[in-house]
Regions:
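Generic low-polarity alpha-helical segments
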Residues: 4, 8, 28-31, 102, ...
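C-terminal segment of N-terminal export signals and the immediately downstream linker at the start
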Residues: 1, 23-48
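N-terminal export signals
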Residues: 6-28
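Intrinsically disordered, low-complexity regions
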Residues: 1-4, 21, 112, 202
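Glycan-processing catalytic domains of CAZymes
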Residues: 38-355
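N-terminal functional modules and adjacent low-complexity/disordered segments of proteins
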Residues: 12-13, 18-19, 35-38, 213
Length: 355
């Protein structure tokens, strides 16, 4: 029995040392202690692509389909530190709630919706960490998961209007609170859907002194669930026509547009990004790209993406003139602290490329 206990103690101690050593690996140079550790040649090819750097990330703690890592404040502090070293700023809370699950005890939702009372105030925690590391924080809205999908757009709007008022009153004093994220993700022209973006976005800006608003819709391409189930993918021309109409409806309510980049094939991406930039310029929006750092090509949902695939997308974004790159998302798929070993390796490859 004692032998078993000693074995477990040794094993856990080893795991802790490994986790600690992963955290020290970061893109910002740090003072190195002289060791006998062997260095290795990367064998990089001479004409390898040159991507643009990732400068922002989503925070996916109220998750749709990504497993939770069950982090507390200590673990999140370590991850914010790793983000900062990689040059990430801002961080964007992808949503304040989804269905019954909410990020903080929002009274406007607890009083009207059938939601669970949360054990942790995630918004206060994230804002406190963003303050500590001098990072900007964008607050993501509540996604009912039902009203807007059922055509009850006004109900979705009213919930988020009340949420904006409560959140700004409670958390607006934080220096890091610098923007809003409109969480409902759409791809094609949906009747009255743009009304949510317009009304909620304008209200958020009015309440907060014109802080920036951001959306991250997806392209109706070959890798969307709908197309893989038999629907027809949008051509580049169709994508331009439909989003020209949507953006015209939300003009003045959205400042940053960051299309998700994972629903089209790698060789198609550049053409869609060029159109996205053209549309953003037309409507005086900043054009970012949402670089998905998870792999849609695998049969398992979802694992960290292969470095070569990420580099292909970063290069396409650079050539298309994207103004910034945000990833979905660092903590699961790129962090040296992630539960996925591949994420730490992706972080290493990324740092080798950009340092």
């Amino acid at each position: 029995m004692n032998g078993r206990r000693n074995f477990l103690k040794t094993a856990f101690a080893t795991c802790s040392l490994l986790a600690g050593s992963k955290l020290l690996t970061a893109c910002t140079p740090i003072k190195k202690v002289a060791t006998d550790e062997e260095t290795f040649e990367t064998f990089a090819t001479p004409d390898a692509l040159k991507g643009m750097p990732i400068k922002a990330t989503f925070l996916d703690e109220i998750s749709w389909d990504i497993p939770h890592q069950n982090w507390g404040t200590k673990e999140w502090d370590q991850d914010f530190k790793a983000m900062k070293k990689m040059g990430i700023n801002p961080v964007v809370l992808i949503r304040a709630g989804l269905g019954k699950w909410i990020a903080s005890p929002f009274q406007c939702l607890l009083g009207k919706e059938d939601v669970y009372y949360p054990p942790v105030d995630l918004v206060e925690m994230f804002l406190t960490l963003a303050d500590k590391y001098n990072m900007a924080f964008y607050f993501g809205m509540y996604d009912s998961g039902k009203y807007w999908q059922e055509g009850l757009f006004q109900k979705e709007i009213d919930l988020n209007m009340a949420l904006i008022d409560e959140v700004w009153k409670k958390y607006g004093h934080h220096k890091s609170f610098q923007g809003w994220y409109l969480s409902q993700e759409i791809s094609r022209r949906t009747k009255n859907m743009s009304k949510i973006y317009a009304e909620v976005g304008k209200h958020a800006k009015a309440v907060s002194g014109n802080l920036s608003t951001m959306v991250s819709p997806y392209i109706h391409g070959v890798k969307t669930d709908q197309v893989m189930a038999g629907d027809k993918a949008l051509s580049v021309k169709e994508h331009e026509e439909e989003w020209d109409e949507i953006l015209n409806n939300v003009n003045g309510a959205v400042d940053i547009m960051a299309f998700q980049d994972g629903q089209v094939d790698y060789h198609e991406l550049y053409d869609y990004l060029v159109i996205n930039k053209k549309l953003a310029d037309k409507y005086n929006m900043k054009c970012w790209t949402n670089i998905e750092s998870f792999d849609r090509d695998m049969p398992i949902r979802f694992l960290p993406i292969k470095w070569e695939k990420l580099l292909l997308k970063l290069d396409a974004a650079r050539r298309a003139g994207m103004e910034n790159a945000i990833t979905f998302e660092f903590s699961h798929f790129m962090s040296p602290n992630s539960a996925y070993l591949q994420a730490g390796h992706l972080y290493e490859r990324y740092c080798e490329h950009f340092i």
